[in-house]
Design a protein with these regions (language model features):
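ADP-ribose/adenylate-binding Rossmann-like module
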Residues: 73-89
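Hydrophobic/aromatic beta-strand patches that form the interior of the parallel beta-sheet core
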Residues: 27-29, 40, 80, 104, ...
């Protein structure tokens, strides 16, 4: 295999291109013109011709794209999603893609700003592995100094709701509240300011999708509100 495809070339798709281009020729399709001569931009139909196709569109657009692909993709292909939630895209792919299409569910726990850092982690699940390409991709990502955590979509979303979901929710709440740096900032306050900077760098749509497409975040937010109320009542006594 010497060529792969990426469908979706937003901020994360561009990062994925940087990661994959170290080992492969990469064809890219995006619904908007890319206008970068260093990117091999191809048509939607040509993007579906390669053996492995990475899907890097926003979560809210994922189902529509997979349904569109379902009657166009040839047997023997492998689709790899990189969504920040996993139960939803896993079900969409299993329900709509032909049985002779392999499926790998991944979540790179890093972004364009942290890819170069050591300690990058990616979750992976082999959803359908007729053609035994799962190990190939696991080995490739490990060769790029990425630690692979093999967990199910359900386990991923349960943990992510109380880690990623919580982090982004708190970051947005603090950003709405307002953070102004002062000359007497404590290390704890600086950490809060850094949290806001990290979480609010992503598009608002990603924040909404992380909250709305993870089946476990509603419970997390309810419990967080309960804890906020509990602590407030304690200090008011």
């Amino acid at each position: 295999m010497n060529k792969v495809s990426i469908i979706g070339f937003g901020r994360f798709g561009a990062m994925l291109h940087a990661l994959l281009s170290k080992g492969f020729e990469v064809d890219v399709f995006d619904k908007n013109p890319i206008n970068n001569t260093e990117i091999n931009e191809v048509s939607f139909e040509d993007a579906l011709k390669n053996e492995t196709i990475f899907i890097a569109v926003p979560i809210r657009d994922f189902e529509e794209l997979i349904i569109n692909i379902s009657d166009k993709i040839e047997s023997g292909k492998t689709l790899i999603d990189v969504c920040s939630v996993k139960v939803f895209p896993k079900k969409v792919m299993k329900d709509n893609l032909p049985t002779q299409t392999d499926i790998i569910a991944t979540h790179p726990l890093f972004g364009p700003d942290s890819l170069k850092d050591s300690g990058s982690v990616m979750t992976m699940e082999s959803v359908r592995n007729n053609f035994e390409r799962y190990d190939f991709w696991k080995n490739y990502f490990e060769s790029q100094n990425i630690t692979i955590e093999e967990i199910s979509a359900e386990e991923h979303d349960m943990m992510a709701a109380r880690s990623q979901g919580l982090t982004h929710f708190v970051g947005r709440v603090i950003d709405d509240f307002g953070t102004n740096q002062t000359r007497i900032d404590t290390e704890g306050y600086k950490a809060l300011h850094k949290l806001v900077s990290q979480t609010c760098k992503d598009r608002w749509e990603l924040f909404e999708d992380i909250q709305n497409f993870n089946p476990y975040t509603e419970k997390m937010i309810s419990e967080l509100n309960g804890s906020f109320k509990k602590i407030s009542e304690i200090i008011e006594k």
